[in-house]
Amino acid sequence: DNNPSGLLVSAKDAQTHARLAIQFFDHTIQRRYVALVWGNFDEDEGTITGNIGRSPKDRQKMFVFADGSDGKHAVTHWKVLKRYGYVTLVECRLETGRTHQIRVHMAWIGHPLFNDERYGGDRILKGTTFAKYRQFIENCFAVMPRHALHARLLGFEHPATHENVLFESPLPADFQSLLTKW
């Protein structure tokens, strides 16, 4: 994904890359994201389990195969951080790391990411007829013209020193500005 803000890890050489890749494969890397999603949750936290693979109808999109017939096993744990009425701020912890995992899983349970055109996070605007609300949403989209996803925390064993390292990143200005509007 090239739209989220926040942390990422990269390797300078093949040996470092191999050591990091093992940690990703073994699911030992800690990754936490903050997302602003549409709708309100009944629960305070939950787990989404559903295989993710390429959509049979649109190869540019990923798709949840709930029956497990295709795709790769994917697990996302989520927790409500704050409710704003029409939108909810959630923290997502990945147990697996599939392409667009948070975006696809959240859309699958009916809570697409704010302003995520690919997975339905812009649909609220298309169905809105109340002019004042429509203008408010358009203004919010202008403040944050990308989907509302931020890689907040990244932890792993350092490939050279074998120390456990943990990095955190505060919400960027556009994300903070968006939250103040709600």
Q: At which residue positions do the language-model features occur?
A:
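RNA pseudouridine synthases
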Residues: N2-W182
